[in-house]
Amino acid sequence: GLPHSASYGKALNAYQYQYHGMSGSAGSYAAKAYSEYSYGSPYHPHHQYSGAYNRVQPPSTQPEKEVAEPEVRMVNGKPKKIRKPRTIYSSFQVAALQRRFQKTQYLALPERAELAASLGLTQTQVKIWFQ
């Protein structure tokens, strides 16, 4: 029975080797898929978020009407200044702000000015958003 056990050992080795080869390629494939996914993932939350944000929007789509009203309204014969309606950020602006916020929690003045200009927002709006 000696040759038999020897060939059994050899077959086992070949099987183990094959198995390792398979798990190796599967492992590297999984790692590759994972790295691609994690690389793309910073943007996924934004798309989902902006999508949800857009769905919530429609009820409040009359900022134009509010802005068209005069800044000062007469109340009991006294002029009363009307506060500007709350800014509604577009989903694109929100996504860009969030992306920037993930990189740096605090913006220096020039960075803030640049970001505000690129998004068509005021620096104050950007500052408040970052708070």
From Swiss-Prot:
Q: Where is this region: Disordered?
A: 48-71
Q: Name one GO molecular function term.
A: RNA polymerase II cis-regulatory region sequence-specific DNA binding
List all disulphide bridges recorded for this chain: none
| Gene Ontology terms: biological process | cell differentiation
A single GO CC term for this protein reads: nucleus
Looking up PROSITE patterns in the UniProt record yields: HOMEOBOX_2 (PS50071)
Localization terms from the record: Nucleus
Q: Which UniProt keywords apply?
A: Developmental protein, DNA-binding, Homeobox, Nucleus
Specify the DNA-binding region ranges. Answer: 82-131
Pfam families attached to this UniProt entry = DLL_N, Homeodomain
Record's function text: During development, may be important for neurocranium morphogenesis.
Q: Which family does it belong to?
A: Belongs to the distal-less homeobox family.
Q: Any idea what this protein is called? A: Homeobox protein DLX-4
Organism of origin: Eleutherodactylus coqui
